[in-house]
Amino acid sequence: KTLFMNYDKPVEEQTLCAFLLDVADSLLRAKGFFEIAGKGWQQVDLVGRRVDLKPCEPKEKAEMVFISKIGPAIIRPLTAAWQQHFGEPMPLKN
């Protein structure tokens, strides 16, 4: 199962990494682009339990793709982890 999200606010690096690590064991991979507070736009890659960030060109809005190891069952833990870390509903699409 592959899911997508867009987001239109800068995020804190520590918050984004904590969110990704909370769901890492249920994902094959996650990749996207976020505006990181204090760092600007970053390409974000999650493989296993490793989160890598590297500078990238500015985007219109943040976006991320999640590739699930557990099929559609990823939706509930993914949205719950986002709510816990960011304090708002996750703008998830499938």
Residue ranges and their predicted role:
Residues 1-94:
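P-loop NTP-binding site
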